[in-house]
Amino acid sequence: MTSVLRCSRTLLLAVSGLLAVPSPLAAQQAPAGPAPAATAQPAPSGQPQTPPPWAQGRPDTDGAAKLAPVVPPPIAAAADRLPVTQLKTPKNFNIEVYASGMANARSLRISDKGTVFVSTRLLDKVYAVVDKDGKREVKTLVSGLYRPNGIALHNGTLYIAELNKISKIDNVESQLDSPPKPTLIYDDLPSDEPHGWKFLTVGPDNKLYFNVGAPCNICMPSPAHAQIRRINLDGSGAEVVARGIRQIVGMDWHPVLKQLYFTENQRDWLSEDLPQELSEDLPQDKLNRVTRPGQDNFGFPYCHQGNLPDQQFGWGHNCNEFTQPIALLGPHSAPLGMRFYTGNMFPREYHNAIFIARHGSWNKTVKVGGDIVVAKLNPDGTVKSVEPFMTGFLVNNNYIGRPVDIELMKDGSILISDDWNGAVYRVTYGAPRVSMRR
């Protein structure tokens, strides 16, 4: 009887969630053809088969058993094999290869002198792309790091966030050929692998902001998890900015309101009690903003997508207790990097809009994401619309690229990293042109 009641409640919540929050993005790029089977390796005979963290709560169905995280190629694609000609943008936007040969290219930062720094998550490196005599050269700036996903630049100092520590390299551009070992500034961080990688940015208050993800698909996190923190540039003065956040891989500041916006990846496998098609379509990932620093709670693990109580942890809670998302970005679309557009190259309609990289789903039979969308805002910072901007990374339900981060160049063009191909693309507006420069 208990299981019947739990199933009925979960199904009711799921249906209400689907009816209450339609998403124009959820139906994008509905590719033809089934997803390729991706099965986990069985545990050795005689050993308990403990599921990996990503499989926590996975329904015991044949369809769900075929879904697993998508592993990127182990090496970067050659420049002439990159999918530039298959990517689509609105009229008069142009795409070119800015740099290639950087396996697992993730976060992007551009210095005042034009050096582009590129992090990795699965490798141990941070790259630097240097323009010399009209040719771009890719250097391995530093190696031997652990999950160095987060990077930030401020006054000539490069900050690097690894799994459980943050370090810095002062005067980094004067030492590109022989950089020193990074100097540790902060290590009061958990060492959990699930959602342990960081995104790093410097706020208008000259403080470093970063995420500490929940160490699970769904669980009751410790007081040290599921939050945004900030520290002074020397690592002192740590404080919590917001709580109730499952996982962030992108943040940026509204150029006028100076409020922090961030993408959030919601839980997987909503319930083993649900039909697989409902479990795959709920919940939707989110775009959030912090309006009450130190007080905002975005609901994890009690509430998902702003209106859907968790079937395990949601009892006794109302989703209205928590800070609501300002946009929903599709189920399991994995929104990562995001950037407010403050340049002068693109048409006026994009001014102060947010470009968001949706890395793409893995736990959906028909995948969504693998694209760039643009959120256009009202003057009060709320979202007016979310529209496709760059598509083509997802072909016949298979990835030929996966966008991660977005950065704005001085001339108003934008850079987009692709960790599937180990490349960075540049998007310009104006007379059509194609370049395959490395």
Model regions: which residues?
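Beta-rich catalytic cores
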Residues: 104, 122, 137, 144-147, ...
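A short loop-to-beta-strand structural motif that recurs across blades of beta-propeller domains
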Residues: 125-128, 165-167, 227-229, 286-288, ...
